[in-house]
Amino acid sequence: MKNAEARWPKESTMEKLEEMRYGTRGAILRYGEQILAVGRECRGFHAAVYEMVETPEETGFADIECRLNLVEAATELFEDGGHAMAWCMAHI
């Protein structure tokens, strides 16, 4: 199993996370300036919290194109997406 840092890129955008299929097999949600990300793999769900380092107001880009930095990634896998998202909510 990959470690948490290898699973989630340190820098990304919501659009790139979607392209990595986290959005189609999990969820990518903006919560203020935080991005809650849940992805699925064959053994379970994983989770990460990102923070926006650019805003649409600063860049003129859509929020999905703004740069993100990884804040924290769960080291464990979860039984379902709800538990993974609950982990994200507890870590913002």
Task: Give the ranges of each region predicted by the language model.
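Amphipathic, interaction-prone secondary-structure segments
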Residues: 25-52
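Short arginine-rich
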Residues: 90-92
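Negatively charged, low-complexity tracts enriched in Asp/Glu with abundant Ser/Thr
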Residues: 2-35
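Short beta-strand segments and strand-loop junctions that repeat across beta-rich extracellular domains
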Residues: 48-62, 78
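A short, exposed loop/beta-hairpin motif centered on an aromatic-Gly-Thr core
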Residues: 61-81
